[in-house]
Amino acid sequence: MIVPINIYSDDVLRQQALPLEGVDKEVEELLGNMFETMYSAPGIGLAAPQVGRSLRLLVLDISCMREYANVKPMVVINPEIVAVKGYRSMEEGCLSLPGLQGDVVRPSSISLNYRDEHFEGQNAEFSGLLARVLQHEIDHLDGRLFVDRLQKKERRKVQKELDALASGRFIASYPVVLPVKVNKA
């Protein structure tokens, strides 16, 4: 089932996501919904907070890109980056920030401990686009968005677009959840 994606300024995107203790039917259903939503948008990565669930869980699939056609879709649960190497700037976008892009500097390769869709422990090295997408999605699990990593000059360039997103003035080609602001009296 395609589920709506939470948009910039929604509180769930700023929370530290909770670790999972296992994979049950509910998590399996969530994973299926996340893949379907990601493919429909279309996107190449999606973290649970982006669909309103504050859990340390993400899915990704970069096989739509010719040079990564042999990379299988991934489920990553409770990820922990344990080592990084090199740095590279690259343009990023995000389904929670429709229409917005910016250059982000990130490590070009990472070593990652995580659990797979069977909740089996894994440790692997990732580089290039796969490392970038993993880091981008892990940021979501830590309550961080790619715009938080922009250089000040770059951030100033996109501030009007961020303000428009926060106030609901944007166009998305996929279902979204608009943030609700609660007045605290």
Curated annotation (Swiss-Prot):
<dbReference type="GO" id="GO:0046872">
    <property type="term" value="F:metal ion binding"/>
</dbReference>
<dbReference type="GO" id="GO:0006412">
    <property type="term" value="P:translation"/>
</dbReference>
<keyword id="KW-0408">Iron</keyword>
<dbReference type="GO" id="GO:0042586">
    <property type="term" value="F:peptide deformylase activity"/>
</dbReference>
<feature type="active site">
    <location>
        <position position="137"/>
    </location>
</feature>
<feature type="binding site">
    <location>
        <position position="136"/>
    </location>
    <ligand>
        <name>Fe cation</name>
    </ligand>
</feature>
<dbReference type="InterPro" id="IPR023635">
    <property type="entry name" value="Peptide_deformylase"/>
</dbReference>
<dbReference type="Pfam" id="PF01327">
    <property type="entry name" value="Pep_deformylase"/>
</dbReference>
<feature type="binding site">
    <location>
        <position position="140"/>
    </location>
    <ligand>
        <name>Fe cation</name>
    </ligand>
</feature>
<feature type="binding site">
    <location>
        <position position="94"/>
    </location>
    <ligand>
        <name>Fe cation</name>
    </ligand>
</feature>
<comment type="function">
    <text>Removes the formyl group from the N-terminal Met of newly synthesized proteins. Requires at least a dipeptide for an efficient rate of reaction. N-terminal L-methionine is a prerequisite for activity but the enzyme has broad specificity at other positions.</text>
</comment>
<dbReference type="GO" id="GO:0043686">
    <property type="term" value="P:co-translational protein modification"/>
</dbReference>
<keyword id="KW-0378">Hydrolase</keyword>
<protein>
    <recommendedName>
        <fullName>Peptide deformylase</fullName>
        <ecNumber>3.5.1.88</ecNumber>
    </recommendedName>
</protein>
<dbReference type="InterPro" id="IPR036821">
    <property type="entry name" value="Peptide_deformylase_sf"/>
</dbReference>
<keyword id="KW-0648">Protein biosynthesis</keyword>
<comment type="similarity">
    <text>Belongs to the polypeptide deformylase family.</text>
</comment>
<keyword id="KW-0479">Metal-binding</keyword>
